[in-house]
Swiss-Prot record:
Entry's family note: Belongs to the ubiquitin family.
Intrachain S-S bonds: none
Subcellular location: Cytoplasm; Nucleus
Pfam families, A to Z: ubiquitin (PF00240)
Organism: Arabidopsis thaliana
Top-level taxonomic group: Eukaryota
Transmembrane segments: none
Protein name: Polyubiquitin 4
BP-aspect Gene Ontology terms: ubiquitin-dependent protein catabolic process
Chain's role: Ubiquitin exists either covalently attached to another protein, or free (unanchored). When covalently bound, it is conjugated to target proteins via an isopeptide bond either as a monomer (monoubiquitin), a polymer linked via different Lys residues of the ubiquitin (polyubiquitin chains) or a linear polymer linked via the initiator Met of the ubiquitin (linear polyubiquitin chains).
Comment field (misc): Ubiquitin is encoded by 16 different genes. Ubiquitin is generally synthesized as a polyubiquitin precursor with tandem head to tail repeats. Often, there is one to three additional amino acids after the last repeat, removed in the mature protein. Alternatively, ubiquitin extension protein is synthesized as a single copy of ubiquitin fused to a ribosomal protein (either eL40 or eS31) or to a ubiquitin-related protein (either RUB1 or RUB2). Following translation, extension protein is cleaved from ubiquitin. For the sake of clarity sequence features are annotated only for the first chain, and are not repeated for each of the following chains.
Cross-referenced InterPro entries: Ubiquitin-like_dom, Ubiquitin-like_domsf, Ubiquitin_CS, Ubiquitin_dom, Ubiquitin_ubiquitin-like
Cross-link position per record: Glycyl lysine isopeptide (Gly-Lys) (interchain with K-? in acceptor proteins): 76
Recorded GO CC terms: cytoplasm; nucleus
Amino acid sequence: MQIFVKTLTGKTITLEVESSDTIDNVKAKIQDKEGIPPDQQRLIFAGKQLEDGRTLADYNIQKESTLHLVLRLRGGMQIFVKTLTGKTITLEVESSDTIDNVKAKIQDKEGIPPDQQRLIFAGKQLEDGRTLADYNIQKESTLHLVLRLRGGMQIFVKTLTGKTITLEVESSDTIDNVKAKIQDKEGIPPDQQRLIFAGKQLEDGRTLADYNIQKESTLHLVLRLRGGMQIFVKTLTGKTITLEVESSDTIDNVKAKIQDKEGIPPDQQRLIFAGKQLEDGRTLADYNIQKESTLHLVLRLRGGMQIFVKTLTGKTITLEVESSDTIDNVKAKIQDKEGIPPDQQRLIFAGKQLEDGRTLADYNIQKESTLHLVLRLRGGSF
């Protein structure tokens, strides 16, 4: 299939790829076309930085998707700024930049005046005259941006997809007004919006003050679907997921929605309804699945196996893996479970440090083997 890669200069490169290609493979193709070494490439899709050992399919990158290529600068460094809406901005900075400088860069990118910006790192609000180095902010650190409001207040609206929208409102705004603001931001007509707060559905003519909705309250937005309907998916752990679907959705579509919500790759999902396993190409209508039906989700482990990872604190983590998984993949799974970035992980087995590009099979790591995880310290020189 073809995908596109857009550079910061606005140039678009077209690549021929397979869903099974790893991010490493894609970077090698970009190097062939553009001469940029893979270690200077960072690829972004849907706001996420893509990890080398993962595949295009893992990130649900489909034909004609567009990736963004950001170059990793030698002397400078990149940091990320996350807004309350969940958007992540990438900035090129130097350790010697002041917080004022950083706010000016955010203004250049996003148009937000510095005096409305509050930057938070490691739970601390950053002061304008200090530098990034003063706060020990290093490459690929993430700052959080909170807007300082004048007069009004901010509230949050959380959608069923998990996205959070930030709105500027007054206590005297009516629910109609709020729905109009959501329409401005997201394009959803007010008559398709249902807003919930403290378990109550909010009525159009009433104000935020009537419902005691105060600054930084979170409302929940549920869509009233036209031809659409809700179905439930129950996992083996007993968790129930709610999905917005159409009768004409295929089983593939449903699995993609589950991936969006839960991060489970479609090829590891088996969906069961009325005792039957559902086939990818068929639609919900084919199986007579109607509104508020419940499907059952069973995970397919592929000739997978379990291994254990023991940390220096004595904690043991259990991972589901394949023999063909690379050490990169294993580190990504540890990151998913424990939040430890791969570049801070060293894995040891049988007294040997494991190299990223090699597979578990290369090291004869079999089911129920135990790896040891040692953390690589930032300032360290491993």
